[in-house]
Structures are given as C-alpha cells and as structure tokens.
Amino acid sequence: HVFGVVMCLAVIFSSCGSNSSKSDDIKPKEVVSANKEVVTLALMPIVDCLPYYYAEERGYFERFGVSVKIATYKSKLDCDTAIVGRSALVGYSDLFHAMMMSEGRKVSVVNSTQGGWSLMVNKSLRIKKTSQLSYKTTAISRFSTEAYLLSSIPKTDEVLLPQVNDLYLRTSMVDNNQVDAAMLPEPFATQCRMRGHKAIWTAVSANNFGCMLTADKVKGAEEEKKIIAITKAYNMAVDSLNARNNMRENLSGILAKWGMQEFPVDSLHVPTYSHAASFKKEDIAAVSQFLRTRNCRFRSSGVLVNDRFCKKAETH
C-alpha cells in the first residue's frame, strides 16, 4: 500500500524528483492519552505550521478533546505521501500540490496557512536585484508556491532552477555555494540572513497558497470531529501568538524541535495570523492558470474551496 502511494505521487510530480534523501522525522513530541486514539499531523518546520506546534506546546489539542502526534518532515512531497497514505490525518502542503494530487487521489483543503518567503542569494555574489539572476542557479521545488512566486518576479525567465525539495538541504546549498540562490520560507530565510546571505526579494505574510490537507476519504463523523478540534486548537494558538503572550519559552522549544537551537527567538518573524479560512475562487484561478501553462494535469473542483472545517471550528 505504501509503495503504491509513493509511486502515485512520483507519477503526479514526475518532473519534481527530490534531491533530498529519505526524510527522517525530527523527533516529534507525542501527546498521548490512554483513552483517546492519537492522530498524526504531518508538518514542516516553517512559520506556516507554527500555530500547530504552538498548540501542541500549550496543550490546546487536548483541551478540545484530541490527542495529537506531530511528525515533522523536510519537504512537502514527504507530507503529501503521509496525507494520501493516511499515516497522517491532516498535513501541510500547498494548493498547487493539492490540485495536482486531486487528479489522481481526492484530497480536501482544511484551511489555508500564512507565512513569508524570500529569494536568498549567496553572500559571495554581487547580485542586488532579480534581473541579475539570469543563468544563475536558484533552488526551488517545482510546480509549487515558490515556483509560482519566482515566476511572478519580473525578469526571472532565464533563471536556472535545480529542484531541491528538502528545505534543510536547500539552505545548506546556499551556505556552501552549491547554488547561487534559493527560494526559502521563514525561518530558513532568516537563518540565511544571519549567516550573511542577502534577500533580494521578500513576500512577508503574503498569500503563499500554503494549506492543510486531509485525504478525501475522511468522511466519518469521528474523523471530522477530530479535524474540527484540530482547527479549533489552531485558532486558539493564532489568538495567543497574535497577542504575543509569554511566547518566548514555547518558541524556544519549537525551534529546538526544528533543529534550530542556535536561532535567537527574537529573530523569528511571527506574522499576524488569521483564524482558519479557506481559499478564495481567485486563488484557485491563479493556481489553475499557472499549472495550465506548464501542461500539468490537475483538478480544481469545489472540494478545494470548501470551508466546512473552518466554519464548524468557529461555530461549534
């Protein structure tokens, strides 16, 4: 079964072969209750997913009656495998991946996410603007948020785009001058800045098309209740993060889980989050246009813009 899931994703993202090695979970902290089944969230160590890590640290999931284990992955493709293989009830991805996966396996968007991206350039290069990137190597993950954002920047048509899905590897390649530049989310972009590399383009808290997905086979009342509870905990974490109440200790623990113990908490850019919300029709249209111009097979049905989880999390 697992082999079948992996092969399915390999076909869907046939042009997206990962340069990363097989992902190892980064020692997720488990919250276990003797009377509850533990559900897994497949997340990435980025600001988009921060409210879920924060909710775990603060015990918000248990407050809403769900026991959660967080599995941390280094790439969206690894999260996708966990989602469609049902080893995770909910997982992080983006709208580009969701629409391509829906061509072969149905998935539903639970809610969109928020975070920042930057185009980081190696400090040894005399590059100050994006027009100077022609025939330079910029590491990205193809058919994804970062590819879309890069395509929206003027005069980047001739940039060379090696695919590096693993964010730790992508950051390391900038550090070691193995690529000229990379599109990086927070906090990896800030980590690069701290090492002297330059940001020549930044989108802070922009619509980055990140999202939480669940396999569309999740239709049972119990599983839906768990997803709603997870979304309620997300909203509570958002309120706490936005209020900036006693964040420091919790964020230190989260950064340690992300393998960024040396990262100063005060340097972490925490955006002003919104409560869980679905994508808008114009988001679907923008992603559809991007995928269509690249001859990608995808599905853009209403399942991707439904807001049943978000609405129920606010009203129940």
List each language-model region with its residue ranges.
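Bacterial signal peptide processing site
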Residues: 17-20
